[in-house]
């Protein structure tokens, strides 16, 4: 199995690569973790990971600047149905639009917009930085065997914006930060997490291993 982690100038690339290598090794999964900016290598990969940190518009520009990358993603993920994982802004780019300072078109895979978080508790700071529990709304193989909910493991978040999905069925999990905040989305062969699996210790490594095993 070859897993393509897309290098388009955004994301915790070294951390993500190391986390995938560790999760594969500890789970006994034979996987080549391929950090690449080559659209052809992405198109031929068995699984695809799109990381991302920073501003939505900047990440979209970076993706557009990689020759053939958006086309490769649409063909490989939508038409060929290869398993896909978006991380943080990589997840947000799955949406229709980002509304951060300006309107930026996303990939349009998940109906909804990425909007600024407005916690009901004014004492909660933006961005949300740190550890928070996740609450699964719809069961999914990426959460198999992972303790979630009030007594569950914590995931690591760093973000000021959230994906406001139009379809509740696309929201796999939420976290509580002055109200429900989308923590994970998914449908068909694609999933995305607002939190960073590569920084989420046991929860993150378990989720990555589940993604590597997942057969949508």
Curated annotation (Swiss-Prot):
It comes from the Bacteria. One of its GO terms (cellular component) is cytoplasm. SUPFAM superfamilies: Class I glutamine amidotransferase-like (SSF52317). It is found in: Cytoplasm. Pfam families: GATase. CDD domains: GATase1_IGP_Synthase. The active site is at 88 (nucleophile), 196, 198. One of its GO terms (biological process) is L-histidine biosynthetic process. Keywords: Amino-acid biosynthesis, Cytoplasm, Glutamine amidotransferase, Histidine biosynthesis, Hydrolase, Lyase. One of its GO terms (molecular function) is glutaminase activity. InterPro entries: Class_I_gatase-like, GATASE, Imidazole-glycPsynth_HisH. It catalyses: 5-[(5-phospho-1-deoxy-D-ribulos-1-ylimino)methylamino]-1-(5-phospho-beta-D-ribosyl)imidazole-4-carboxamide + L-glutamine = D-erythro-1-(imidazol-4-yl)glycerol 3-phosphate + 5-amino-1-(5-phospho-beta-D-ribosyl)imidazole-4-carboxamide + L-glutamate + H(+); L-glutamine + H2O = L-glutamate + NH4(+). Heterodimer of HisH and HisF. IGPS catalyzes the conversion of PRFAR and glutamine to IGP, AICAR and glutamate. The HisH subunit catalyzes the hydrolysis of glutamine to glutamate and ammonia as part of the synthesis of IGP and AICAR. The resulting ammonia molecule is channeled to the active site of HisF. This is Imidazole glycerol phosphate synthase subunit HisH. It comes from Brucella abortus (strain 2308).
């Amino acid at each position: 199995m070859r897993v393509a982690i897309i290098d388009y100038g955004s994301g915790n690339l070294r951390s993500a690569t190391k986390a995938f290598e560790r999760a594969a090794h500890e789970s006994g999964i034979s996987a080549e973790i391929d950090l690449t900016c080559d659209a052809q290598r992405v198109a031929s990969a068995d699984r695809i990971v799109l990381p991302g940190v920073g501003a939505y518009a900047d990440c979209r520009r970076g993706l557009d600047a990689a020759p053939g990358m958006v086309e490769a993603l649409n063909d490989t993920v939508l038409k060929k149905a290869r398993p896909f994982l978006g991380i943080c802004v990589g997840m947000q780019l799955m949406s229709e639009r980002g509304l951060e300072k300006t309107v930026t078109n996303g990939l349009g895979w998940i109906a909804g917009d990425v909007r600024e978080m407005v916690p009901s508790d004014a004492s909660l700071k933006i961005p949300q930085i740190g550890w928070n529990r996740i609450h699964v709304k719809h069961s999914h193989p990426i959460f198999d065997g992972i303790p979630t909910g009030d007594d569950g493991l914590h995931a690591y978040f760093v973000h000021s914006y959230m994906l406001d999905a139009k379809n509740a069925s696309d929201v796999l999990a939420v976290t509580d930060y002055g109200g429900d905040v989308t923590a994970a989305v998914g449908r068909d062969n694609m999933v995305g997490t607002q939190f960073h699996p590569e920084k989420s210790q046991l929860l993150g490594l378990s989720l990555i291993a589940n993604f590597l095993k997942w057969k949508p």
